[in-house]
């Protein structure tokens, strides 16, 4: 059997956070001029503001975007898995998260120790969910799978992840 070269499998996004899925939508993510590709490294200082996210699709389709860190507080002991950084629902296709309803405001990456994975997951909604979704009581111990199941979102339609680690104090500004 050949080894998988899918970066979501190699990076353990499939398994730790998501089940295997077939991408059916396009999502492009940028922090400033930096285009995010699976497994790339981003300095936390470049991710202070929410990324620019463009979603393909038709305006009559609605999407949910979730961003989590499955490595909180540390990759070797992720006992807060997953730490949720952002939730936006009811995003019209062909637009971006600013057109949706923000359930949980964006929180920039703050990896305390080790290399953390930050995962942006896009789901296609069957109907509007904005009135049903509440802000989680805590950012810790969120489950993307349980969230998707609770709101009948099914499998993701697109996902991208990046890595980040704590920057030396002299570089943070």
From Swiss-Prot:
Disrupted gene: phenotype observed: No visible phenotype under normal growth conditions, but mutant seeds show hypersensitivity to ABA during seed germination.
Any one of the GO CC terms: cytoplasm
Location of N-acetylalanine modifications: 2
Signal sequence interval, chain numbering: none
PROSITE patterns to which the protein is assigned, alphabetical: PBP
Keywords recorded for this protein, A-Z: Abscisic acid signaling pathway, Acetylation, Cytoplasm
Matches recorded under InterPro entries: PEBP, PEBP-like_sf, PEBP_euk, Phosphatidylethanolamine-bd_CS
Gene Ontology biological process terms from the UniProt entry: abscisic acid-activated signaling pathway; positive regulation of seed germination; response to abscisic acid
Transmembrane regions listed in the UniProt entry: none
PANTHER family: PHOSPHATIDYLETHANOLAMINE-BINDING PROTEIN, PHOSPHATIDYLETHANOLAMINE-BINDING PROTEIN 4
Name of the featured protein: Protein MOTHER of FT and TFL1
Organism: Arabidopsis thaliana
Originating gene: MFT
